[in-house]
Amino acid sequence: MKLRTSVVWLLFCTFANVNSALANRLKVALSCEHSTTISRQELMNQFPVTSFTTQLPWDAEPAKFSGVKVSDLTALFAPQKPKILYFSALNEFRASIEVNDLVEYQPIIAYSINGDAISIRKRGPFMLLYDLDKFPHLNVPEYHNKMIWQINEVSIEECE
């Protein structure tokens, strides 16, 4: 029985580590069939960090979120102005944002909350967020639905 418990525990730990490693990666796909995967650490190292403190409608308290501006990500991976961006979550939920939002509201792909990595349990590893305190008129269901969490892929529609 001890051996069986040990084997089950070993398999669980192995799966949890693999799952955790995969969860900390973000796939960026272009409509012209090119894609790349970037880790949380690479996002932190390759892009300027953008932070803001805001109150999200589903949280009791304001929190400080840090991440990369979506516009910085698209500037690297899609230098021509993209048409639309789609965000996919681990549970296959999808949301889209218009390119105008990138300039006007500067949403971020957040990877930390109050200085800590966002776990899957806390809606991570990546979340698309708007600064609702800076732009209170965005605190409406239409924009709440765009603030997707547990992001695992960003699809950039740019190719003709």
Regions found by a protein language model. Name each.
Residues 22-160:
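N-terminal intrinsically disordered, low-complexity segments enriched in P/E/S/T
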Residues 1-8:
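Bacterial N-terminal signal peptides that target proteins for export
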